[in-house]
């Protein structure tokens, strides 16, 4: 179980891996600059981390690709977990053992990560079971909706107390506060997403509806940066206290954000029945379901060595030696 090296790329010709080759090549090229720039200042992730499992260097058994989800590096995501044809000889139990070892290698290979996110199709009970064995818990069950937005966005006058604003550095704090209110508490804590992370992960146009009376974002749609899906993805956030916006105001927001796109994917929680019915009324078709899994990573801090403790003790006792500046004595009142 080793990090991917450039000389291994020619051996990743298994059909299970070939679609990942452009991503792996890019990651290898950018790993050096990524580490250097991250030491200078927190920055968005440039490159993924890849671990490869192999018995024979020319026949990889599987690989795992992971990436930072925020600038601080506190949250990481497992992007891809694949087994090759060579792992089939080990049987189903052997293949699962290989994938479990890959997940552990990814987690151990990112010592600064405090939390991990992974997703799995809702119908893949094997993958879900594997993630649970590695300490992941289900935080959200989502429906993926495929939508063909209209060529002409809805022409609608918003209520007087709502203003349509683009996401930019000036308005990002309002969008971040909206997402904090809309996300489940545990997922919000594990993602550890800051304002800069929100901007890093968004493309234009990303829009929000601002309540002008409270100066508070109450609904927003972000166009996400391209990931492993070929179809662009939109993220819809609605403040829990503003569910009445389900209708034309939110439809306007979606259509404006999806302007110029042929097809898009939109996620929603399967438990939000009213929300899902409204999405379906817009002509969206369910593409499938996905489970968001997460886990925390607790690392035991190494005890201080006796040498370090001795130096600290000497520094304290040194103040009591003759010729040293006297320690002030507090005066009683």
Where do the PLM segments sit?
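Conserved GNAT acetyl-CoA-binding A-motif
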Residues: 110-121, 259-270
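Catalytic cores of nucleotide-enabled group-transfer and carboxylate-activating enzymes in metabolic
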Residues: 62, 90, 161-168, 176, ...
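Short, structured motif recognition centered on aromatic/hydrophobic residues
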Residues: 50-51, 75-79, 102-107, 116-117, ...
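Amide-forming acyltransferase catalytic core, primarily the GNAT-like/NAT-type
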Residues: 1-65, 133-230
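Conserved acetyl-CoA binding element of GNAT-fold acetyltransferases
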Residues: 73-94, 228-243, 247
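Intrinsically disordered, low-complexity segments enriched in Gly and acidic/Ser/Thr residues
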Residues: 213-265
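Active-site/acyl-donor-binding loops of N-acyltransferases
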Residues: 134-155, 261-333
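Conserved acetyl-CoA-binding loop-helix of GNAT-fold acetyltransferases
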Residues: 88-108, 129, 133, 242-257
């Amino acid at each position: 179980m080793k990090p991917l090296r450039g000389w291994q790329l020619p051996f990743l010709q298994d059909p299970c891996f070939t679609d990942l080759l452009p991503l792996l090549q890019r990651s290898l090229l950018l790993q050096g600059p990524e580490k250097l720039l991250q030491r200078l200042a927190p920055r968005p992730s440039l490159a993924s981390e890849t671990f490869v499992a192999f018995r024979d260097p020319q026949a990889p058994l599987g690989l795992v690709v992971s990436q930072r989800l925020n600038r601080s590096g506190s949250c990481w995501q497992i992007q891809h977990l694949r087994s090759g044809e060579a792992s089939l000889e080990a049987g189903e139990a052997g293949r699962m053992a290989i994938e479990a070892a890959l997940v552990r290698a990814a987690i151990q290979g990112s010592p600064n990560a405090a939390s991990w996110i992974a997703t799995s199709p809702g119908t893949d009970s094997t993958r879900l079971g594997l993630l649970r064995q590695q300490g992941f818990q289900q935080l959200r069950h989502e429906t993926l909706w495929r939508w063909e937005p209209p060529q002409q966005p809805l022409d609608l006058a918003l209520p007087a107390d709502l203003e349509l604003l683009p996401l930019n550095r000036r308005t990002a704090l309002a969008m971040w506060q909206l997402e904090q209110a809309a996300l489940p508490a545990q997922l919000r804590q594990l993602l550890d997403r800051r304002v800069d992370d929100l901007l890093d992960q968004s493309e234009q146009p990303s829009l929000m509806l601002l309540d002008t009376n409270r100066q508070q974002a109450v609904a927003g749609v972000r166009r996400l940066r391209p990931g492993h899906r070929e179809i662009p993805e939109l993220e819809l956030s609605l403040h829990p206290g503003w569910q009445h916006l389900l209708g034309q105001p939110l439809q306007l927001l979606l259509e404006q954000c999806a302007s110029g796109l042929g097809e898009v994917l939109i996620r929603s929680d399967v438990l939000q029945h009213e929300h899902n019915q409204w999405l379906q009324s817009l002509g969206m078709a369910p593409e499938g379901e996905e489970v968001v899994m997460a886990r925390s990573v607790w690392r035991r801090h190494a005890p201080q060595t006796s040498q370090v403790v001795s130096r600290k003790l000497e520094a304290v006792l040194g103040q009591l030696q003759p010729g040293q500046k006297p320690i002030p004595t507090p005066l009683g009142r």
